[in-house]
Amino acid sequence: MLRYSAHLPLKGIGASGQKRIRDAHVALIGVGGLGCAVAQYLVSSGVGQLTLCDFDTVAESNLARQILYRQSDLGRLKTEVASETLNALNPETRVQSVTHRVADEDMLKIFPACDLVIDASDNYGTRLAVNRSCLALKTPWIMTSCIRLEGQIMLLHPDLPEQACYRCVYGNAPDTLEDCPGAGIFAPVAGISGTSAAHFALAHLAGLPTPAGLHVFDAASWQWQSLGINKNPDCKDCSQILEPVIR
């Protein structure tokens, strides 16, 4: 416990909260700018098991904001490099990897063993797939995203049917939304958004209350805004939740 001794005096965490963190299994979708920051704090804070899901390789354009990787890692699988770095950071955490693009059927196999899912991917289609799978399994999950000088984060509770789901918030937005290579991303904003997601994750796992709604960060004005989200009674994802089919 010495490694985590700074957590122990904190009201609402203490030894029991740290044990809940230690006993938790988290799936992380995407190990890019957001995912690197999330993974570092989850592992350094003692999450028991972390499953990394990413099929991409390290490119030079990643290095400014994806802080688990180095120049010597170019061309290697991100999950491979991240696992090595995270194991060196804290060998007490079991890190495992999925190195292909995860689809709905993969998520329905991976997520049942998880206490929490974090989506740090860079596309709307993947987030919708995570939303569908977590709704079916009633698994809590965190959405985090960033672009330009803006970041977003939201903790979703599919086990609470009165709460909105991801599609309730974003509707039928196309998968042609702007991305970081096209619109740009200020490197520290990826870190701020990722560490904020790690905060939400660790607080949730430890049993601390976390604020509901969508939380939006604007680095240009250095302001956070929290938005209340209403459930859409006609949402095609959460208005008729199907039981999972796990093969």
For the regions a protein language model found, what residue spans apply to each?
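Glycine-rich phosphate/adenylate-binding loop
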Residues: E105-R247
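Aromatic pocket-lining residues of Rossmann-like dinucleotide-binding sites
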Residues: L42
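A structured beta-alpha segment of the ubiquitous adenosine-cofactor-binding alpha/beta core
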Residues: G75-R127
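Conserved N-terminal Rossmann-fold NAD(P)-binding element of oxidoreductases
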Residues: I29-G30, C53
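Hydrophobic residues within alpha-helices
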Residues: V38-A39, A82, V130
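N-terminal charged helix/coil linker that caps or initiates catalytic domains
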Residues: M1-A27, E60, R247
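Hydrophobic/small residue at the entry helix of a nucleotide-binding pocket
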Residues: L34
